[in-house]
A protein has these predicted regions:
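Phosphate/nucleotide-binding beta-alpha loop and adjacent structural elements of enzyme active sites
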Residues: 1-173
Length: 173
């Protein structure tokens, strides 16, 4: 039973990655939890609006980093381990938005990708985190599984400099 009332929905408290581990560092951001992940926010980011122009983000100077990078230890599983354990026969759409750890997750999803039809993922190009991604980072796992770029479904432009910060991309077989 779950709080959403859907039999097919359940919550699991761990991270996905390229290996199964009992302990990995996860960095929590209290002010904006959606920015939390296995990579720390970069306090020296040159492109972050929240760091460099906090008033544009509706913040006071220093607020953004004040409660960032709070370290929490969590378990980590490969996507293949999770899908195998739950005996999931196929995946219509695999959605990844994991703050620059998408490539690590895909590395641990070789078997899962074979039974997945569509992958929708985010690519962060700028320096908000201590890691960013390129198309190569994800395509080295997607192309061998038969995926091709179908669409760049969203482009986020940085209002400070006009550069593309991140994109949502769709890959299909």
């Amino acid at each position: 039973d779950n709080s959403l009332g859907y039999d097919e929905v359940s919550c699991h408290n761990f991270a996905f990655g390229d290996t199964d581990k009992e302990e990995v560092k996860f960095y929590y951001h209290e002010l904006q939890p959606m920015l939390s992940g296995v990579y720390q926010l970069n306090p020296n980011s040159k492109d972050s609006i929240a760091i460099n122009e906090p008033d544009l983000a509706g913040l006071e100077k220093g607020d953004f980093l004040q409660n960032a990078n709070q370290e929490v230890i969590v378990k980590q599983h490969k996507l293949d381990t999770f899908v195998g354990y739950w005996d999931i026969p196929n995946i219509d759409i695999l959605k990844l938005d994991t703050q620059c750890s998408e490539a690590k997750i895909l590395k641990g999803a070789e078997e899962t990708l074979e039974k997945t039809s569509v992958v929708l993922t985010e690519l962060n190009f700028y320096d908000l985190y201590t890691r960013n991604l390129s198309f190569y980072d994800i395509e080295q796992y997607l192309k061998p599984a038969g995926f091709k770029l179908y669409d760049i479904s969203y482009i986020s432009k940085n209002p400070l400099n006009g550069r593309t910060d991140w994109v949502d991309v769709i890959y299909t077989k």
